[in-house]
Amino acid sequence: MIQNQIKEQSLKVKMCGMRRKEDIAYANEVKPDAIGYIFFSKSKRYVTGQQARELDQNLDQKILSVGVFVNETIEKVTEIANEVPLDVIQLHGDEDVIYIEQLRQQTDKEIWKAVRVKDTKDIKEAQQLPVDKLLLDTFTEEKDMYGGT
């Protein structure tokens, strides 16, 4: 059973979609494990690398800074990851093993991958990806729906 294969870990909390100074102030108050900046231009919570860098300067250093990317070029991901700078790169699109391996050669940042889960087969396949952490997201039939479910 899949539950037996998952290592016991404590629950982690990430607040995603940080866009305003007030968002960062609230995060500093409630102390999640991580916050996320969305670097997907089709998202209503999109921020630029410059905006994220300015916000991140006020973030409590104990809180991980995560950049969320959807089908972005490796060059752009590493550029933004270094500009902010991010602690973690989260891939939330259709990135495959080859993409992840190439990205890993370009950065020392932790890499997380969000996968849309329809059934346990999706989880088993995702466990084979060369990433540091997996995030399980609700499956949706909408073709270009990434996150926000």
Which residue stretches match the model-derived regions?
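Conserved N-terminal beta1-alpha1 strand-loop-helix module at the mouth
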Residues: 1-149
